Amino acid sequence: MLAIEVKNLTKNFNGLKAVNSISFKVKEGEIFGLLGPNGAGKTTTVKILTTLLKPTKGKANVWGYDILTQRDEVRNSIGIVFQEPALDNRLTGYENLDFHARLYGLNKTKREERIKEVLNLVELQDKAKVLVKNYSGGMQRRLEIARGLMHYPKVLFLDEPTLGLDTQTRRHIWDYILKLNQKEGTTIILTTHYMEEADFLCQRTAIIDFGKIIVNDTPFNLKNILGGDVLSIEAEPVKEAFSVFQEFPWVKKVSRHNGFIDLNVEQGEKKIPLLMKIDQKEKGFEIKSVNLRKPTLEDVFLHFTGKTIREREASQSEKNKMVMQRRFKR
């Protein structure tokens, strides 16, 4: 069964296409990722699928229900963890969950049973009676996930669930997400701009940029598009080194970002000695360091867009600023 089916979904905001005719499907029980920079259209897509925004064009079904004509059925089938905190800091963890469950009409017996289940799932059972204002950022995020599960949703939307958390806490949240998917069988739609998060959690990932889905596949298959190895080289001057590396027949692709030059090659360990044989003085550059690694989703993003996700975030911000300036000049 398909948990979500999206066809040619579009959303315009005053001349700006936040979502541009995207289509994708999510299978029941799957963790599906929308991966892209800030401003790419991820959150707008989630808001449309959760009936918080109406699309300009296109169709979508969530758990078999039309997002436009069956909004109540959609809302009863989903849970949402928003990017911005939505807990009441004046209540305890237990009280936050109890309040949410009451909104969905769970009786007292069912509420108490479910609160115990979800608190155990995110390992907050010992903090149930503590005021949320005394929770750490990671604990609050775990409680928000627990709250999103209170009414037994078929589909759970997680919008940037680890944004602003430190690396260790982020990895703990990943473990809880995997556990709830495996233990409860919940279908999860995850938005993120963290490449390693999508790689670790998602069975399939759609890379979205400027409102369009660029490519959609498993993280393994996406990285396999590039194949082989990546030699990440620090060299000075970059321009001269880049020109020389482009001439090598054994280099499949050359790209540069953040002061480094990346070479996509086969059997990278055998290519490092070839690099070291270059007469660097004659060619007019110096190799400072060489790092051998496998392709990442960052490399995939760079391959399809020509920029890293951080560079794209900067250009998206500049584009939005220009649109706003033109609007105010009218």
Language model features: what each stretch is:
Residues 156-159:
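Catalytic Walker B motif of ABC-type/P-loop ATPase nucleotide-binding domains
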Residues 230-308:
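Short, charged/small-residue-rich alpha-helical element at the C-terminal edge
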Residues 175-266:
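ABC transporter nucleotide-binding domain
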Residues 131-135:
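Conserved ABC ATPase signature
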Residues 152:
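Conserved catalytic motifs of ABC-family nucleotide-binding domains
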